[in-house]
Amino acid sequence: MDHIDAHSAVSTSSSSSKYDTPDDNISEQRLLCDAKEEYPLNDYLFDGINQESAQRSLLLCRQTFETSFGFALQSYVFKRTSSNSYERITYVDYVSADSPADRCGITRGDMVIAVNEKSVVTASHAEIVESIAQCLQVSLVLVFKDVARIVELSMRSIQLRFMLDAKIRELRMLEKTEEDLQALYDDEHGNEEEDESLESTLYELDEELKNVQNPQEKEANGTDYRHLIRINSSTSVGTPQVTRL
């Protein structure tokens, strides 16, 4: 096991409150620490993860409250379509280079399972942040599932669904216009110029319908739909909670 800076990670034998000071004389501490228990995972978000092998325990350490652990947490709430229920997840969204978090091996996408040996799977974003921020030494139990990528794909899925809905509405409008023009063409027996004009219009509509039926994946009118799935630590739509620690 690699050895690291004493102020980056130490063993999980103890955790400190805001009134404690890390031991500056500690040497050759281990990066990974033995978890004292396995914490239950959320079935919806943790499918495919081997619970026992995936969980890893780290102990982060800083000298003062003015210094940073070097990572940022972000919380989302995902909606389970099968049961129409909401499930929260808090994960590491950013890790500063050469920070205590970086030297400990914390990775963007790590999910926070427990803080100081207390499960936080159902805790709010504010509760998790408070439990970490009040410590000079904090033990974390993490599971990696690249949540950042999952969120990006979820955003893209939302965007594509809105684009598809917009194209379907456009298609229906064009089909209705085509039907009206076709009816007008069938009923009227005007001069050849009018007939040619109608035929030209119908041809243009056919071309538009082909384009609608094969839409390219691009942003609809420059609209950004990401906010639709960025929700806070409760269950309502709003601004995502991001906190640097």
From Swiss-Prot:
Membrane as a keyword of this entry, yes or no, is yes
Task: Spell out the PROSITE patterns in the cross-references.
Answer: PDZ (PS50106)
Post-translational events:
Phosphorylation at a C-terminal Ser/Thr cluster is required for limiting autosome, but not X chromosome, movement in early prophase I.
The superkingdom listed in its UniProt entry is Eukaryota
Task: Name the Pfam families for this protein.
Answer: PDZ_6
Q: Which SMART domains match?
A: PDZ
- Give the residue ranges for region: Disordered: 1-25
Q: Please tell me one Gene Ontology term that the record gives under cellular component.
A: nucleus
Q: Where is this region: C-terminal Ser/Thr cluster?
A: 233-236
Q: Which residues carry this modification: Phosphoserine?
A: 233
Query: Which body tissues produce this protein?
Result: Hermaphrodite and male germlines.
Other facts: Shares partial functional conservation with human CYTIP in meiotic DNA double-strand break (DSB) repair.
What function does this protein fulfil? Plays a role in early meiotic events; during prophase I contributes to normal meiotic progression, timely homologous chromosome pairing, synaptonemal complex assembly and meiotic DNA double-strand breaks repair. Effects on homologous chromosome pairing and synapsis are alpha-importin-independent. Limits early prophase I chromosome movement in a dhc-1/dynein-dependent manner.
How does the record describe its quaternary structure? Answer: Interacts with syp-3.
Protein name (database record): General receptor for phosphoinositides 1-associated scaffold protein 1 homolog
